[in-house]
Amino acid sequence: MPRSRINGNFIDKTFSIIANILLRIIPTTSGEKEAFTYYRDGMSAQSEGNYAEALQNYYEAMRLEIDPYDRSYILYNIGLIHTSNGEHTKALEYYFRALERNPFLPQAFNNMAVICHYRGEQAIRQGDSEIAEAWFDQAAEYWKQAIALTPGNYIEAHNWLKITRRFE
């Protein structure tokens, strides 16, 4: 049974109903419709913490989806799952792949910066300040890109850049 029929959340049900109506109205191929169904089911599973199911749906959506912009969001969501699972190297890979298809994803830049900052903090705890600085510098670059795309967002990152004198 499609996930859209079993989800009990009002907002998710409403989204599913509207999405189904739009899929009938908007001229799309059956492959695009099927890709969107997998994407929608992946988002639903992800929101419930069912990451294995979400990944299966996202991989199917990737197999079917041809539009680079739409693929960027699928890849981004796969990156989110890997981030949640602590698989930071994999997460970075998927965020990079998302940005290759859509360079206007500030949330991907932000998440990459958060991972780099976390790795910098880990390096400090391990007593390696040189490696830590390299990770912090990389985090700064990603945060600058996120902020450039959406000025006024990422206030904490902006403040960190100022405090650490990494903002130009």
Curated annotation (Swiss-Prot):
Domain of life: Eukaryota
GO biological process: photosynthesis
Bilayer topology annotation: Peripheral membrane protein
TPR repeats: 35-68, 72-105, 120-153
Cell location: Plastid, Chloroplast thylakoid membrane
Primary role: Essential for the assembly of the photosystem I (PSI) complex. May act as a chaperone-like factor to guide the assembly of the PSI subunits.
Family label: Belongs to the Ycf3 family.
The name this protein goes by in its record: Photosystem I assembly protein Ycf3
Species assigned in the record: Daucus carota
